[in-house]
Structures are given as structure tokens and as C-alpha cells.
A protein has these predicted regions:
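N-terminal small-domain helix-loop-helix segment of the aminotransferase-like
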Residues: 2-4, 9-100, 107
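Conserved core of the PLP fold type I
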Residues: 61-155
Length: 155
């Protein structure tokens, strides 16, 4: 049996498991429970998106791209932001594609938080903010918000 305290870094060992994982485990063992967690859509991926994926595979596009994203996708994101929001971003220098929201949040926090920096985290919030902040050596400062204030940070 592996003693994880001996092989994992202390910063990882000291991260508490998310309470939502326990909830998922409990709800998965119960009949008739409808999960409202994790933000999975309640519809299939649209056919044109699935077809584009199939076409890419058939064309042999199965290799790694640049670690910041495929050049064609980066340019399209830049064009979309210009068309929809009138914002200009340089696709080679100002856009990064990630595999999902959690990776994007992790990269952003790692890019701006230094050891010892305090990071204000309004609650309720996404479960990853606090552990990622701790992993980079930041100090989470939890601010509880209330429904009667529309969950806005107040004094």
C-alpha cells in the first residue's frame, strides 16, 4: 500500500478534498437522484461539431498543436471577439486555449499569484479557487456573501 504522505508534496497532501466529490459519491449510490452538479449539458454535442471532429481525425489531424492552441482556432477566437464584442486581441500573443475552465483558472492563478499573496474568494464559489490558490502559495481570504445581497461582496 502506498503512503501518499511520503510520495506527494506537502502542498498537495494538505489540500482538503472538495465536499462536492462526497456529495457526488452519495448521490450516485441513491436511486432517482438527478445530478445538478459539474455543469454537464443536458443535450448532445451538436452534429456539426461532432462532424468537424470526425473530419479532423479522417484528415490525420491527430498530432500535438502549439501548447497555446491551434493557430486557426486562435485566429477564429480573435475574429469572434472582434465581431461580437469589438475587442481586439492578437491571436499569437493574447489568446490561450485550454482544455477546460479548470485549467484556465489554474493557469490564470499561477500567472498572477505570488507566494504569500492574499486572494479574495467570495463564497459561494467554484470549488477549485481555494485549493489552486493554496497550491501556488497564495493565502485564500474567504468572503461569505448572502442571497439577500444578491451574493455581492459588501462591507
Amino acid at each position: 500500500m502506498i503512503n501518499y504522505d511520503e510520495v506527494l508534496s506537502s502542498s498537495v497532501v494538505n489540500i482538503k478534498p472538495s465536499g462536492i466529490r462526497k456529495f457526488f459519491d452519495i448521490s450516485a449510490s441513491m436511486e432517482g437522484v438527478i445530478s445538478l452538479g459539474v455543469g454537464e449539458p443536458d443535450f448532445q454535442t451538436p452534429w456539426q461539431i461532432r462532424k468537424a471532429g470526425i473530419n479532423s481525425l479522417q484528415q490525420g489531424k491527430t498530432k500535438y498543436t502549439s501548447n497555446k492552441g491551434n493557430d486557426v482556432l486562435l485566429k477564429e477566437i480573435s475574429s469572434y471577439m472582434q465581431r461580437k464584442y469589438h475587442l481586439n486581441y492578437n491571436p499569437k500573443e493574447q489568446i490561450l486555449v485550454t482544455v477546460g475552465g479548470s485549467e484556465a483558472i489554474d493557469v490564470a492563478i499561477r500567472a498572477i499569484v505570488n507566494v504569500g499573496d492574499e486572494v479574495i474568494i467570495p463564497q459561494p464559489s467554484y470549488v477549485c479557487y481555494e485549493p489552486i490558490t493554496r497550491l501556488v502559495g497564495g493565502v485564500p481570504v474567504i468572503i461569505n456573501t448572502k442571497a439577500e445581497n444578491d451574493f455581492k461582496v459588501t462591507t
